Each structure stands twice: as structure tokens, then as C-alpha cells.
Amino acid sequence: MKIKITAAILLSMLFTVSCTDLDEQLYDQVEDGNFGNTTKEIDALVGGAYSSLRGFSDAISNNFPTCEYVFFLNEVVSDEATIPTRGTNWYDGGQYQDAQKHTWKSDNRMILSAWRYNYTGIAKINAIIYQIDKSSLSDKSKEPIYAELKALRAYYYYNLLDLFGNVPIVTDFEDTALPTNSTRKEVYDFVEKELTDAIPHLNPNAVYSKMTRNVAYSILARLYLNSEAFIGQQRWQDCINMCQKVTGYSLTPDFFSNFVTENQTSTEIIFAIPYDSKAGTVGNYMNSMSCHYNQKLAISAIPNNYPWSANGMCAQPGVYSAFADTDKRKKCMLEGDQINLATGTVIMMDNGEPLTYTENLTSLEDAKENEGVRLHKYEMKAGEQWERDHDFVLIRYAEILMMQAECYVRLGSPDLARPFVQQVASRAGEELPATIDLAFINQELLKEFTFEGRRRTDNIRFGTFFEPWWSKGTTEKYRAIFPIPSTVLTTNKNLKQNPGYPN
């Protein structure tokens, strides 16, 4: 039997889960009872839950996958990255300037895209759980399946907790009532309980790109690390305890092996979004969004054998110079003359000027084409196109080490922090100072995780988010979370706007 979702129910789902363009193939019909009764069918269902991690292209997110906007949003409101307007390019209604200046409003498309991305993933998981409920599998067989799905759903809710705070908790596929806000504390408690309840039933082994115990421990560690920022409660020791439960991973000897095209063999990656252009999945666009249009000439001497690039995101002034020249991680950015592989000369831009990346920018509102140091963390090579095969890294073992180091410093035990941060810094060729303090930890986080879509959260935790920097003044405290998108509020009158933002 198939349950056909009526137009009214589908419309309800659209605003219940934040107005997302649900994939018609996935959501116009839900099998009831006749599907999900074999291992192969269950694997297909659970595999479908992970596909939403890649995001989807739509008009709201300018035809770039929505997952990219989640990471852009966390970067361009931080002290790390910016998307300056260059002539008439990258203005897009001022959404990037507003993000950098911390003057965003509830109609910002990046904010809407981040909301929709997470709730689309949640909606799909709710539908799959509903389908498994109706299957003929035994309750015991269903336990690990439910655990995996609910832990993955908790990952999306963690993102919403971090970004928006007071969001609706939607878990019942059949419930078409318009939801109300949950408090940030309620969302926090929900994420913690979902992960804690799931852990005993999750796979204890390291399984690439799947929701395992190690991934759940890592998300809980993040939750406890940011607990003070989220709910005003310090849980540093709980963060350490979760980190110590993560096993089976190690730092790769070469930092950049985590970002090569075939990075799925890394011993360091705990959780990632898998991409495969041959399979037709949306690729990792991070480098492409950053490099100049003519960067292609530095990648391949053969015409039409290089990836396209958009000349968008770049590092803010001061980020590149924060790295010592001996720091191996500094190569994650491109600075200076870009050389044409075919001619051996400096690449020229279309305006006749040399493509020489500079750290400084004239302004956020009118930057030159070559201004801003560019992202080069993920491998770029000839033969690739816009969509790439690099799996997007979400959690690395380096983060597990750095969380422990930070928490020990915050607990007043910097000597206990040293061996953890030592592993990370030594790989980069960096020596530690005599005393490990929070200022050093903050800088080390900047350098280790540059352009990995997490800097905003660090800024908030260290308090720097609210201080003036390159292109912004002092930030109001309420902007630690984003507004609920205006289109969501229009569609669901039961929702209230986050404090500080106009309705």
C-alpha cells in the first residue's frame, strides 16, 4: 500500500520543515508496508537519509548546493573569510556585505538556505523512520536503524541549535500541525538525549561517512564545548570525556592528505560528506568559489582541462599573515603571482593586469579582482570541472585533540593541554610557546581549520565575535544566533522571531 501525500499535507510539510523544495521523487509517495522489509531495501532507505547532506540546488541559493551556504555562512560572518563585492559581481542584493558587517536581516538568502538545508535533511529522516515503522522487521532489528537515523537527525538539529537557537523540533512524519518554537535549552536537551540514547546501538567501528558511535561522541563533544554559549552552562569536563571516547583515528602525517581528491582513505576524517562526480552527486565547490576566473591557467596547460572558478570568497586581511612562513598549513591559501603553466609567465586578468593575489582589500564594497588571499585547501588538478570528487570534511581527529586542549586550558590545567595541541602544531612544523593559553588556542584553531566552515562558532565561544574587526563595528549580543527567515514566519504564524530581530 502507498500513502499518497496530498497537496495540503505537502504544503504543510513545506512550512513545517521550513519551506524547502522537497525532492518530488522522494516525497510524493511513501511506501507503507511493502517496502523496507529486506536488508537491501533498508540499506537503500538509510542511504537516502545521507544524500541530503550534499544539499540541493535551487533558486534560493543561486543554484549552488544549499550545504555550501551553511559553510559560507559560518565563514563570512567570522573573522576569517569574506565575499567582497567586485565591480558588479558578488553583490547579490547585499547579502554578503550584510553578513560581513553583521547587519543581516531575516530576508538574507544565505540564512534561509541554511535553515532549509537542515530541515530538508530532518524531513527526509522523519519520512524514512515512518516507513521503517511500517515495515515487517522485528523491533530488535529496527533498533540500530533508528539509532543511526536519529543520530543523523540530531546532527541537523545541532546545526539549527548553533545557527538559530529557538527552532521547532519536528520528529513525527504524520503530524501536519504547524509547530511552535522550542527554546534553545529544549533543542540542546533534545540533541543530547537523541545522541546519548542512540550511542549504545550505533556501530562502534570507524565506518567512513556514516553515523557511528565515534561521530556521535564527536557531536556531543562539540555540544559540551559550546554549552556555555548555547545555554550558559560550562561543561568542559564533559567535552573532554566525550573526546576520550573517540577511538580508531589518528592525525595523518601530511596535513593536506585530508583534502586530496580521494580523501576517503584518511585516518583522520571522522565524518564527511561524500562526493563522486562519476556518480552524478553535487561536488565540493569550496576552491571553485574562491579562485579567480583565470586561475584555471595555473592548473592545466591544456585548454578546457581545468575547473571553473567564481572569484568569490577570500581570506580577510590579517589571516594569511597570522601563519608563520614555516607553518605548512599556510599553503592552504594562494597569495602572490599566479603562473600560467603554458607560458611560465604571470597570468593576466581580462582587464590586462597581472593576477597577483594580495592580502589586503581596498574595501568590502568595491574590491579589485585580484584582492584577497584565496582558498587552496582542497586539491585542484587538471581534468576536474566545477563539481569535484573531494569529500567535504565535517569532523577531523585534529578537532578532537584541540577540543581537549581548549577545555584543559579553560579548566586551569594548561600543562594537560600541551600534549594534545602539540600533536597538531608539530605536524604543521610549529613550536609551542612556553605557556598554552586561550589566545594561543584561538589562533591555532584559526590556522588548523581555515575555511572548514566552523570559525563563527569559535568566535562566539571566545567572545571575539562581538568585537570590531576589519569591516565591522561592535556586534550586538543577540546576533549570536540568526533570525528565523522571514518567509518561514510568513508561512507559519505559530513561530516567533528570535529576540532582538524585528518580526
Predicted features along the sequence, with ranges:
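Flexible, polar/acidic helix-loop-strand segments at domain edges
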Residues: G87, Y91-T103, S321-R396
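An aromatic- and glycine-enriched ligand-binding surface/loop that stacks and positions planar moieties
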Residues: T20-W90, E192, T196-D197, K210-Y357, ...
